């Protein structure tokens, strides 16, 4: 029996509000995170991902309080990311009620941090988030590079090699966002999703670019993703989670109804 594919609404939170941007800029407000999370919990989302996109020092306390409030209302797995830099940060978020933490820039800065995190808390709690951008020219073999700091800082690191290294270090899941597709609504970058899904032994969550329900199906069937993450199609009422699940099931994708 194949494992059911997961639908994960994503809350990008900036200064205590859910927002949605295009290619990491051009932000619009999508509501109060606790209310938004409750709505998805009621709709039957499989998980929720909460990414603190400001994640500045002054924002941390607010984030912890928001995570506590969400965890009190929501009974599906909650992943929290943004500004997770130390083992203490991980402990704080897990104690606040997160089930998993997502590590991005801190992993690039110190890959051993991922190893220590997986050893300390278990791989099942550790998600490594990868923001990948295509850097190969037309006609060259496709190549994607890791960017950090909300997609602003190039690292020179190959995305596929990095995904393999991170799973070797104990990451239990890869959250893959295509920087080229983020917010565009024209579908996932299926090539990089497939390349990473084929390269690593852990689940891959596809993110960046969902504009319709067919894109979710494509992410799973063509991209090989184990889970699909979406924000604006759910936040702004274009589709509901049950509609997405029904659509996917009708097209032969195993989902939890």
Swiss-Prot record:
Pfam families on file: His_biosynth
- Gene Ontology MF term list: imidazoleglycerol-phosphate synthase activity; lyase activity
List, alphabetically, the Gene3D superfamilies matched.
Answer: Aldolase class I
Q: In which pathway does it act?
A: Amino-acid biosynthesis; L-histidine biosynthesis; L-histidine from 5-phospho-alpha-D-ribose 1-diphosphate: step 5/9
Q: List the disulfide bonds.
A: none
The active site is formed by 12, 131
Q: Where in the cell is it found?
A: Cytoplasm
Provide the catalytic activity annotation: 5-[(5-phospho-1-deoxy-D-ribulos-1-ylimino)methylamino]-1-(5-phospho-beta-D-ribosyl)imidazole-4-carboxamide + L-glutamine = D-erythro-1-(imidazol-4-yl)glycerol 3-phosphate + 5-amino-1-(5-phospho-beta-D-ribosyl)imidazole-4-carboxamide + L-glutamate + H(+)
Q: Which UniProt keywords apply?
A: Amino-acid biosynthesis, Cytoplasm, Histidine biosynthesis, Lyase
Q: Which domain of life is it from?
A: Bacteria
Offer one example of a GO biological process linked to this entry.
L-histidine biosynthetic process
* Subunit details: Heterodimer of HisH and HisF.
Q: What protein family does this chain belong to?
A: Belongs to the HisA/HisF family.
Briefly state the protein's biological role.
IGPS catalyzes the conversion of PRFAR and glutamine to IGP, AICAR and glutamate. The HisF subunit catalyzes the cyclization activity that produces IGP and AICAR from PRFAR using the ammonia provided by the HisH subunit.
Put simply, this protein is called Imidazole glycerol phosphate synthase subunit HisF
Which organism is this entry from? Saccharophagus degradans (strain 2-40 / ATCC 43961 / DSM 17024)
What's the gene? hisF
């Amino acid at each position: 029996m194949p494992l059911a594919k997961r639908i994960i609404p994503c809350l990008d939170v900036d200064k205590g509000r859910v927002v949605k941007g295009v290619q990491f800029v051009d932000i619009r407000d999508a509501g109060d995170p606790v209310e938004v999370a409750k709505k998805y919990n009621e709709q039957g989302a499989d998980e929720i991902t909460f990414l603190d996109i400001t994640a500045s020092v002054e924002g941390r306390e607010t984030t912890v309080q928001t995570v506590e409030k969400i965890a009190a209302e929501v009974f599906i797995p909650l992943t929290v990311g943004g500004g997770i830099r130390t083992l203490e940060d991980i402990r704080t978020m897990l104690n606040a009620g997160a089930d998993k933490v997502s590590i991005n820039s801190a992993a690039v800065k110190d890959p051993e941090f991922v190893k220590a995190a997986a050893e300390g808390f278990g791989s099942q709690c550790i998600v490594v988030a990868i923001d990948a951008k295509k850097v190969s020219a037309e006609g060259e073999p496709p190549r994607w590079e890791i960017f950090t700091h909300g997609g602003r800082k190039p690292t020179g690191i190959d995305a596929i090699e990095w995904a393999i290294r991170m799973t070797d270090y104990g990451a239990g899941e890869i959250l893959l966002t295509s920087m080229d597709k983020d917010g565009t609504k024209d579908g996932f970058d299926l090539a990089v999703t497939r390349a990473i899904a084929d390269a690593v032994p852990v689940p891959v969550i596809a993110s960046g670019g969902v504009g319709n329900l067919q894109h979710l199906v494509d992410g799973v069937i063509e991209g090989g993703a184990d889970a699909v993450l979406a924000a604006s199609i759910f936040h702004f009422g274009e589709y509901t989670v049950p509609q997405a699940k029904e659509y996917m099931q009708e097209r032969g994708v195993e989902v939890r109804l």
